[in-house]
Every structure is written in structure tokens, then in C-alpha cells.
């Protein structure tokens, strides 16, 4: 039974009437463009075929009722006429509450909803299960009540909910790709303007995500430190963000910068350039050049931004040794663990899977998790 069938059946069973709509919103993986989003730079993610699915129907009152199928059918209920505050024990419900609260501030022309939620985006793997949930909930209200909100506004609403209601800092990429993703395409997103350009993916290429399952500990504090170092760099150049600094300008005065800040700045500037070129390489079907850019990105994250760990570097080395110049591999996400992403010909997937299974655990003592994904459509009815 797929997620649509599961949520529709559960909806009818619990609420004793059929759902009128089923909405999905996907998770995502970032192919290239790491730690560029909060520097007003470029990112190149694609939506993946793991998603949050919500079967739903409008109510004729002001109550929101939610069933979390993946949490033992826990029930959440709140009124649109009372102040929406955080739930003490059901953390999942705060994503729903936050999205609804911020939707009210944007466009309050909606009533109550019954919904059943289920998803298969792996949690804690850096594949944006939370953004997928936020965008799915926003799309439910937009579709049921014909709200005049586009995908970018639904994405911004989800980001606000996560930052201000749930209390977790995030850029806009995760929600934007979940809302705007296009089947068989990646999306080159300008994080300053929120402009997005669909980039066709070469035929016969698989998106492989491998979770190192290394438990991240430093990610919060180190993320904030990197952000501060980037802001220091932008101030040095008297620019609002590193997006506005050219590599030429940087190279001319790099020796005057604090050495660590200089390394951080060099990563962001070079990564922005790589991301724009990667979009062009993908469109041309030049998997070899894409692989080189991904390798340069990983080296920059390892040596200049210093956010990889030995387990991640080991995974990258195993995949690279298996695929040679037929595709690319790099760490993806915030760093200090998490996942690597590889773009490889579909016929090489079994060899990569076997090489990783044979070598990664033997070298690190940790068992990986292996996902093969397709670039998928963004949020909407399913």
C-alpha cells in the first residue's frame, strides 16, 4: 500500500467519511552549493521521490484535526479562533501549528481541516523531512481554500514557521525545492532573489544518497561559527554578503584577511562559481565535468570550510574509486556527518552499492544506509 492509499484508508476509518484531496511534498538533496544559501548565493538541489503525503478535507467549522500515521496515529486538535501556541510533548505537531499560525498572518481566509499525515523521507538524514512536512501542510490549506499563494510564498511560510515557531534556523532552499521541484530536473536557486531555473538532468543518471550514519555533534555550534566567519569576510569587503565579492577581489587582498576567515571566504566564492557552472554542465549532459565540480566542492568543504569528517571522506573515496570519471560524489548538507550525494550512470549503481557495503563498515565500524532517488515533482495533488 503506498502513502496515498494508506492515508486515504486511515482518513476514512478514523473520520468516517472520505478525504477530498491528497497532497504530497517531497524531500530534497542538494547536488552542489553548500553553505552558500545564507551568503545570498546559489544552490542546485533536486526534489526526491521520498515525500510527506496528507489526505485531507475541509471542515465547516474552525477546528484543525490532525492524525500522525507515523506516530501511532497520535491525534492533534486545535482551534483557528484561539492563539496557536507550541505543543509541549508532540514535537511533530509544532510544524503543523507553526505553518497554520504563519498562514493566518499571511492570508486568514480559511477554515478548519481534517488531515492524516504520513511520510517516508528519512528523518535525521539531512533530506529535509521537516521542510517537506511544512510545505505539504501549507499546500493543503492553499488547495482546499484556494488561497492566492504561490509555491515561493508557501515555502517562505514554512521557513518562517521553522525559524520562529519551531525555533530552528534554516535557509530557504529546503522549502523552496520542495514547493517548486520539477520532475527529471534540478533547480538552480538564487538565494537572494529566490529566482529558480529548472535544469534538466541527463537521461540514465541516478541520484544516489548514502547516509554515513555518523552521529553529528558539532553541527549547531560550528554552523553558527561558519556563519559568523562569512559575515566577518563580507564586512571586510564592505559588502552586504559574500555573494557580492568576486574571486579576483578576494585573491588581491587574501593575505590581509585572518587566515581562517580567508579559507571560509574562498570556499563560498569558489562554491558559488562551481554551482553556476554545474547547472550548465548538467544541462549539456556533461557528467564528467559535473563530477570534477563535485570533487572540487568536496575538497573545498574538507580543506577550506573544514566541515567534513573522516567517515564522510571515506565514503566519498570509496564511491570515487568505483565510478572514476563517470559522474561525481561529494558531501551534502550542513557537515560533520550526514550524507554524501552521487550522480552516477544507472548501470553503475550495483557496483557502487557493493563497494560501499564491502568497505565502509570495515573501515569505520558504521553501517551506511543507501538510497537511490529520482528527481521528482514539487508539492501538489497526488
Swiss-Prot record:
Q: In which pathway does it act?
A: Carbohydrate metabolism; galactose metabolism
Q: Which UniProt keywords apply?
A: ATP-binding, Carbohydrate metabolism, Cytoplasm, Galactose metabolism, Kinase, Magnesium, Metal-binding, Nucleotide-binding, Transferase
Q: Does the keyword Cytoplasm apply?
A: yes
Q: Where does ATP bind?
A: 124-130
Q: Which residues bind substrate?
A: 34-37, 223
Give the positions the UniProt entry annotates as the active site. Answer: 174 (proton acceptor)
SUPFAM superfamilies per record: GHMP Kinase, C-terminal domain (SSF55060), Ribosomal protein S5 domain 2-like (SSF54211)
Q: Which residues bind Mg(2+)?
A: 130, 162
Q: In UniProt terms, what function does this protein have?
A: Catalyzes the transfer of the gamma-phosphate of ATP to D-galactose to form alpha-D-galactose-1-phosphate (Gal-1-P).
Protein's UniProt name:
Galactokinase
Query: Which organism was this protein described from?
Result: Salmonella paratyphi C (strain RKS4594)
Amino acid at each position: 500500500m503506498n502513502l496515498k492509499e494508506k492515508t486515504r484508508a486511515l482518513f476514512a476509518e478514523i473520520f468516517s467519511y472520505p478525504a477530498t484531496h491528497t497532497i504530497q511534498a517531497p524531500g530534497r538533496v542538494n547536488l552542489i552549493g553548500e553553505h552558500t544559501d545564507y551568503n545570498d548565493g546559489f544552490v542546485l538541489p533536486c526534489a526526491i521521490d521520498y515525500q510527506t503525503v496528507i489526505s485531507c478535507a475541509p471542515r465547516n467549522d474552525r477546528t484543525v484535526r490532525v492524525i500522525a500515521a507515523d506516530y501511532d496515529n497520535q491525534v492533534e486538535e486545535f482551534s483557528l479562533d484561539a492563539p496557536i501556541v507550541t505543543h509541549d510533548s508532540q514535537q511533530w505537531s509544532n510544524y503543523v501549528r507553526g505553518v497554520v499560525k504563519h498562514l493566518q498572518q499571511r492570508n486568514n481566509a480559511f477554515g478548519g481541516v481534517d488531515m492524516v499525515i504520513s511520510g517516508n523521507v528519512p528523518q535525521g538524514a539531512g533530506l529535509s523531512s521537516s521542510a517537506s512536512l511544512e510545505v505539504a501542510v501549507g499546500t493543503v490549506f492553499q488547495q482546499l481554500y484556494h488561497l492566492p499563494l504561490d509555491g515561493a510564498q508557501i515555502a517562505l511560510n514554512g521557513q518562517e514557521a521553522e525559524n520562529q515557531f519551531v525555533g530552528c534556523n534554516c535557509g530557504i532552499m529546503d522549502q523552496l525545492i520542495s514547493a517548486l521541484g520539477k520532475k527529471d530536473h534540478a533547480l538552480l536557486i538564487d538565494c537572494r532573489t529566490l529566482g529558480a531555473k529548472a535544469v534538466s538532468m541527463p537521461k540514465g543518471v541516478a541520484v544516489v544518497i548514502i547516509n554515513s550514519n555518523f552521529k553529528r555533534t558539532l553541527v549547531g555550534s560550528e554552523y553558527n561559527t561558519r556563519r559568523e566567519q562569512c559575515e566577518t569576510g563580507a564586512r571586510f569587503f564592505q559588502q552586504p554578503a559574500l555573494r557580492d565579492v568576486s574571486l579576483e577581489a578576494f585573491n588581491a587582498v587574501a593575505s590581509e584577511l585572518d587566515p581562517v576567515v580567508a579559507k571560509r571566504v574562498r570556499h563560498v566564492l569558489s562554491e558559488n562559481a562551481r554551482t553556476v557552472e554545474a547547472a550548465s554542465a548538467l544541462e549539456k549532459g556533461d557528467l564528467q565535468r559535473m563530477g570534477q565540480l563535485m570533487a572540487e566542492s568536496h575538497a573545498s568543504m574538507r580543506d577550506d570550510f573544514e566541515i567534513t569528517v573522516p567517515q564522510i571522506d571515506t565514503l566519498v573515496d570509496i564511491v570515487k574509486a568505483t565510478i572514476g570519471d563517470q559522474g561525481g560524489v561529494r558531501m551534502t548538507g550542513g557537515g560533520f556527518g550526514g550524507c554524501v550525494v552521487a550522480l552516477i550512470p544507472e548501470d553503475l549503481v550495483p557496483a557502487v552499492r557493493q563497494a560501499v557495503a564491502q568497505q565502509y563498515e570495515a573501515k569505520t565500524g558504521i553501517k551506511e544506509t543507501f538510497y537511490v532517488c529520482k528527481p521528482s515533482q514539487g508539492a501538489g495533488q497526488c
